[in-house]
From Swiss-Prot:
Designated gene of the protein: PC-21
EC numbers on record: 1.-.-.-
Subcellular compartments: Membrane
GO biological process: mycotoxin biosynthetic process
Domain of life: Eukaryota
Organism: Penicillium crustosum (Blue mold fungus)
Name of the molecule in the record: Cytochrome P450 monooxygenase PC-21
Source lineage: Eukaryota, Fungi, Dikarya, Ascomycota, Pezizomycotina
Disulfide bonds: none
Family that this chain belongs to: Belongs to the cytochrome P450 family.
Sites where the protein binds heme: C456
Transmembrane domains' residue ranges: 4-24
Primary role: Cytochrome P450 monooxygenase; part of the gene cluster that mediates the biosynthesis of the indole diterpenes penitrems. The geranylgeranyl diphosphate (GGPP) synthase penG catalyzes the first step in penitrem biosynthesis via conversion of farnesyl pyrophosphate and isopentyl pyrophosphate into geranylgeranyl pyrophosphate (GGPP). Condensation of indole-3-glycerol phosphate with GGPP by the prenyl transferase penC then forms 3-geranylgeranylindole (3-GGI).
Membrane topology: Single-pass membrane protein
Gene Ontology cellular-component terms listed: membrane
Length: 510
């Protein structure tokens, strides 16, 4: 009888606790209850899965403009659980910079990233992150990046030469044809990070059967089935997955293991070269080894991280910048004139390619592409202690959404043409020089590389890659879209790309 009584007491207490946590606390007690709330969620799970809706970040961009707010909007997940959408430079500055130590990536997100891109800088937090970034900064100084321009240019010109080989010669020295830049973008990005990052010659551009490219295409495939593989690989014990009749997961795991093996071999090669003491370090990995501050396994993890970040992110932006230029013949012509004036065909080998950093329109095109199409369209943080944002109390465990796609396209921050590709916003009309703000009033209006301690350490490396690819392609070809009516909506969860690809008609120029 006593056992039965305790059972029912437990049931009643559990029901009371559930009612308090699900109904009373979120809407009557929590300090977050006074924030503007979204009413657009699903009737059952509210906004619990809003981060996965395609295009990524589009819903949040709409909420940002539709719901009056002072910098934060409270979205609700399962059972009324809060999720705070940051919407203003002030709230972003608090989370990313002023109180950065109070926030970390979600544990689940870090676990997924660790499985896919390695246990490097991207997944590190706290003092571990500080120490890793401190050691890595020496490899990403402006002089070190400028020294890599000849490497980038070599790979970019290899791209244009290989594209030319796929075109048809008309007998008068002109090559014409159609190609899809979605095919070429990951290959040239892989070759660039291979050469400049690790001292490796992948030849992905000319090798149709490039093993490293195939591994990455399969490991980072687009689709819900692939995303399920990533979650399962992260959340379920390997011994259970190995017994399941799931060929797709096995292929995913095999590709991730192959990438790990590649990284192991590259580090082995680089350390052997370093031991010979032959010359000044000429790539990122060689610079890291030269410091003597890394163990062998730490080098492997950082290489995995930089391979994923340096390849996938750059590849995505290359696709979008080619789409933008192929869609605007006038902009393309202006850019070509600027490039031809600064990079004459005669004695090009004697030109300091770092001059690309000084070209206003080239840098404007690159910045505008990164603004409109950030490689990472959404990110998460969680409060690891009780804190405040814009003087508003935030309980420990509160998750936050940081959505570069929404912030970068906010008409309140970028003006009425925020959704339109307008490279000229990055050029001062009075001087004709490049500016680094695009007309926005705050640097937090541009979130593509985030800000603060966790900003992207490789952003200048990525910009240098993009400058050289754009310069090489636009100097070599005239481009127009093969099908202007094609669907160019962003698809994919990690690094979105145009849904129907970037099919362009090319005509050789040099």
């Amino acid at each position: 009888m006593i056992t039965v009584t305790f059972f029912w007491v437990g049931i009643v207490l559990g029901a009371i606790w559930t009612f308090y946590r699900v109904v009373l606390y979120p809407y009557r007690v929590s300090p977050l209850r006074t924030l503007p709330q979204s009413q657009r969620g699903h009737w059952l799970w509210n906004h619990a899965f809003s981060e996965f809706l395609q295009p990524i970040g589009q819903l949040h961009a709409e909420l940002l403009l539709q719901i009056p707010n002072d910098g934060m909007i409270c979205l609700r997940g399962l059972f009324g659980a809060p999720k705070i959408l940051l919407t203003s430079p002030k709230s972003l500055a608090d989370v990313l910079v002023h109180r950065a130590d109070d926030f970390e990536k979600l544990p689940g997100e870090r676990k997924i990233l660790r499985a896919v891109v390695g246990d490097g800088l991207v997944t590190a937090e706290g003092d571990v992150h500080y120490q890793q970034k401190r050691k890595l900064l020496a490899s990403f100084t402006p002089p070190k990046i400028r020294a890599l321009y000849p490497v980038f240019w070599k790979e970019a010109t290899a791209l244009t030469q290989q594209i030319r080989r796929t075109l048809t010669h008309d007998g008068s020295g002109i090559y014409t044809g159609t190609t899809d830049m979605v095919y070429w973008a990951p290959r040239v990005s892989m070759d660039m990070i291979g050469a400049a990052g690790f001292g490796q010659s992948f030849h992905s551009v000319r090798d149709v059967d490039s093993e490293i490219i195939h591994c990455y295409e399969k490991a980072f495939a687009i689709g819900a089935g692939h995303l399920l593989c990533v979650f399962a690989d992260t959340l379920l014990p390997r011994i259970i997955l190995q017994w399941l009749p799931w060929p797709r997961w096995r292929q995913f795991r095999q590709n991730i293991d192959s990438i790990q093996d590649f990284c192991h071999q590259w580090v082995t090669d680089a350390k052997a070269t370093s031991a010979l003491g032959d010359g000044i370090p000429s790539n990122l990995l060689a610079n890291m080894i030269h410091t003597g501050e890394y163990t062998f396994q730490e080098l492997i993890e950082q290489v995995r991280t930089f391979l994923a970040a340096g390849h996938e992110n750059t590849s995505s932006v290359v696709m979008w910048v080619m789409l933008a230029l192929a869609s605007d013949s006038e902009l393309q012509s202006r850019l070509r004139q600027e490039l031809q004036a600064s990079l004459p065909e005669v004695e090009l080998d004697k030109v300091d390619l770092a001059i690309l950093e000084q070209l206003p329109l080239l840098n404007a095109v690159v910045s505008e592409t990164i603004r409109l199409f950030p490689p990472l369209p959404i990110g998460n943080r969680i409060a690891i202690r009780d804190t405040t944002v814009m003087n508003h109390p935030i309980p420990k465990g509160t998750p936050f959404l940081i959505v570069p796609r929404a912030i970068n396209r906010s008409s309140e921050l970028w003006g009425p043409d925020a959704d339109r590709f307008n490279a000229d916003r990055w050029i001062n009309p009075d001087t004709g020089r490049f500016n680094n703000h695009g007309g926005a009033s705050s640097n937090y209006s541009f979130l593509s590389f985030f800000h603060g301690p966790h900003n992207c350490i490789g952003q200048n490396f990525a910009r240098a890659e993009l400058r050289t690819v754009v310069a090489a392609v636009i100097r070599s070809f005239d481009m127009v879209l093969d099908n202007p009516a094609a669907d160019v909506s962003p698809v994919g969860w990690f690094t979105p790309r145009p849904a129907d690809g970037v099919k362009v008609k090319l005509r050789s120029l040099v």
